[in-house]
Amino acid sequence: MGAPGQVTLQVYVKHGCETCDRARKIAQLVDAEFPEVSVEIVDMNESQPQREDVFAVPTYVLEDHILSLGNPQESELREEIKALLRVRGLV
């Protein structure tokens, strides 16, 4: 997980998943825009998910809570992250 004081976003993907390519790009955008967010790409081809509730890809998990099955609207993802950062006092 992320360093203390950081928020963690995990994005579960698989090779050959067309929408997962977009998920990787969204993850890169979040990583560039929010230095307070630790972004982790979890490739389900390489390892089994540690979560039983991740059964589809892409899946976005923000601070241990499933935020989206499938790619969210970028604006909605930004708002969710900003809201969590405000609650945590990181912005």
Predicted regions and their residues:
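Structural micro-motif
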Residues: 52-61
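Non-catalytic, surface beta->alpha helical segment in thiol-disulfide oxidoreductase systems
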Residues: 62-91
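Thiol-based oxidoreductase modules, predominantly thioredoxin-like and allied folds used
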Residues: 35-48
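Residues at alpha-helix caps and immediate loop-helix transition turns in enzyme cores, especially N-
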Residues: 22-23, 53, 73
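Local sequence-structure signature of Cys/Sec-based thiol-disulfide redox active-site neighborhoods
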Residues: 1-33
